[in-house]
């Protein structure tokens, strides 16, 4: 039988509720048209709408960030939770302004954004630190642990979201701490990401706030 590259993620899918497009329950959702890049996947999953190319006049689909308003009239999960009094933070290891992700998050939910620039400004990384899109997922999960602990210390409910990037095309980023079990970088990066995600989930499950917490794991795009 074939050896799984991501056994930890497969186990999470099979032992929990999985919205897979496969009968086996292993595999992500089936991507719809105009949801196949980062900010489009974020918008589709939070507001249920695709980002049509005509929104940017036929230009590069990430040009939506140049507009003052991001999807005016759309109503997202972030806005629902904001009205319910949730503290909301989004952690990412790249610049939130890319593709207009910052506008999506601030105009549809009033998120506190902790991105690559935030990490530099607050001394989490040095000013000249740059790997891959900004900083690697190993740091992302550590910063997410710190932020989850901070949010949980408040008496308000919270929505913490994080966006991994090591598995992003074209080449993907293989952290030096990741094992090189397989013969190619693609497999090794995904295998490492599977372990990192599972470790973060297990950490959350060990925390006092886990009892009233829902964890959602989703691929933002292919």
Spans of model-derived segments:
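Solvent-exposed soluble domains appended to multi-pass membrane proteins
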Residues: 1-222
